[in-house]
């Protein structure tokens, strides 16, 4: 499945005729043999619908820690579902006896705290994927939190020394709601926040198709693992500066934030050919960030392809990922239903109180979760069906196809006898047919790719049988075949059941 998913992503890129070969010289990834990397691929594009709120000041990280699902501070541990307590051993050791990062949360632009890794907590100047919930524990929006600016050097050093500063990424339409939320939660926190409008957002990925699935993926040993050893601001700044200036030396001072996609980490650990996705935020005067891409940072030849935002959305849908509030109806979904518990440092179960924490903590503690988000593909999606789905004001139901030969009679439910005798609305002994529960609901789609919230009870008949169940949805007079795809996290989830 993982090989198929990777191949599907790469096949999407082959529809472009504007491939440009780039010959690389100086090695940035020194452990890779160039002879195995004849067809490396850089795919990039601008993402137009993103906006940013800048938050800065000495109380910034404490303020954000009370609003997002990620653990941004090491100083609180949860004793049970309803209490928190200040840790006496803060900044000393984590629960696995690993050294904890050293930083002053109120002074200096030190980056962002990552609570979990194989080497314990660490500091980074790369953004993290997180979420904002409402008071009932439902998702308002996901977000990327970027330490800003991306690069620390002589030109930005004076700014860096003042206090923490972050850019928070949102879809444009939800910015007014987030500004209102920030204002209501500000209280006495020493922070300032405002919308930053003069920005551009870019997605790109780099893959090494010349490798085999069984080869080690270069991004693991050259980026993921080294990141987890960064325990102070100086080390994380040095790593970020080296990485960013190696890739984009001409515009490094115009990069306001840099995000390394970590939600695909399981895939990269199992597939040497899997692409690594990135997102960068630049100032608006950058016409094309990838004209400044430094091909000499790698020891092999690239194909360079430009794609639109729909392409990158489809890539994320194939992985089963959200990318902004435009994909959902806000206040309708729980973060664990969206598999945020399988993403690095996205949801913490031991950070203490934050908005929406009670339901999330209770769900995590009890393990009772009836639905999860999975990727799907449509088999026969017509233009009319696309139009109707885009106009739909609720999540369309997905039903399981039942073979008429094996179909069981629908169960009947008796109504309670009426104490008033016969009713003009029907006999008291009328039998009512129970409505079958939908197998799932369609959350978002683009082209033939989508994400759907499926009932967990169907997983066995989808993924663990030689003859998987068939599914469909009906919109208007259109019946659309729906094929569930295996999510990246499925094996880990299955082993935990």
Swiss-Prot record:
It comes from Candida glabrata (strain ATCC 2001 / BCRC 20586 / JCM 3761 / NBRC 0622 / NRRL Y-65 / CBS 138). This is Iron-sulfur cluster assembly factor IBA57 homolog, mitochondrial. It is found in: Mitochondrion matrix. GO terms for cellular component: mitochondrial matrix. Belongs to the GcvT family. CAF17/IBA57 subfamily. Its main location: mitochondrion. Pfam families: Beta-barrel_CAF17_C. One of its GO terms (biological process) is iron-sulfur cluster assembly. Keywords: Mitochondrion, Transit peptide. One of its GO terms (molecular function) is transferase activity. Residues 88-107, 404-428 are annotated as: Disordered. The keyword Mitochondrion applies. Residues 1-36 form a transit peptide. Residues 412-428 have a biased composition (Polar residues). PANTHER family: TRANSFERASE CAF17, MITOCHONDRIAL-RELATED.
